[in-house]
Amino acid sequence: MSLMREMLEAGVHFGHQTRYWNPKMAPYIFGHRNKIHIINLEQTVAKYQEASKFVKQLVARGGNILFVGTKRAARELVATEAARCGMPYVDARWLGGMLTNFKTVKSSIKRLKDMEAMVADGGFERMTKKEGLLFQRELDKLNKSIGGIKDMNGLPDALFVIDVGYHKIAVAEAKVLGIPVVAVVDTNHSPDGIDHVIPGNDDSARAIALYAKGMADAVLEGREQNINGLVEEIGEGQEEFVEVQDNQA
C-alpha cells in the first residue's frame, strides 16, 4: 500500500475546524469540507519523507532522538514505538527544564536507577511496611515522569513531537539549546521554529500510530547503517593491519 493511501486511511488529511486555523499553515492546506480544513497530503508525504531521511541520517551518525507524546491518544503509541527502536521518550507530563535543566534531571535519573538496583538486590523486602509503601510510591512517581529517559545520558540530538501546541515548552527548550525538532503540526498551530514540519492530524490514534511507527522505522534503518559503517571501518582497519604484518614478515 502506498504511503499516500495509508495516510488517507488513517485520516492524516483531516485538520481542525476552519475557525481555529493558523494562517501560517496555509501552504499545507488543500481546502475545506464541512467547515474542516483538509491538509494537502502531497505536501505531507514529501515532508514526512524529508523528516524520515533526517532521522535516519542522524541515527546513522550515532545520534539519538527523543520521542515526545504526552496526549492521551499518543502516550502508549509513542512509548511503544520509541521502546521498539531503543530511543528515549516522554509519555507523561513534560517537566519544565527537562532539557534546559538536564543536570537536575540527571540526579533524578540516578535516584531512579539506585532505587531499581535496591529492588534487584532484595532491599525492598527488608523494609518495613510503611518504608516499603513510601519507597514504592516514589519509585512509581519517578518511573512515570522520567522512566522513558532513564537511559538518556546526555541531551538528545533531536526531538520528535506529536502536537506542537500541546508541547510548547518542549519545543521552546529545544529551540533555546539549538536542538532540531521534527514535529506533527495540525492546521490550528504554527509551524514556526519547527525544523522538520509534518503537516497532519495530531488527534487521530491511527494517524499518530503511522507517524510514530514511521519515525521508529527510520531510527532502525539509520542504526543498521551505523552498524554496517562501523563494521566496514573495522574491516578496513584489519586489512591494513594485516598488510603491515605481511610487509614486516
Curated annotation (Swiss-Prot):
InterPro entries per the UniProt record, alphabetical: Ribosomal_uS2, Ribosomal_uS2_bac/mit/plastid, Ribosomal_uS2_CS, Ribosomal_uS2_flav_dom_sf
Biological process, per Gene Ontology: translation
Statement: the UniProt record of this protein carries the keyword Iron: no
GO function terms (MF aspect): structural constituent of ribosome
Keywords: Ribonucleoprotein, Ribosomal protein
Pfam family, one: Ribosomal_S2
GO annotation, cellular component aspect: cytosolic small ribosomal subunit
Family designation: Belongs to the universal ribosomal protein uS2 family.
HAMAP family: Ribosomal_uS2_B (MF_00291_B)
Protein name, as recorded: Small ribosomal subunit protein uS2
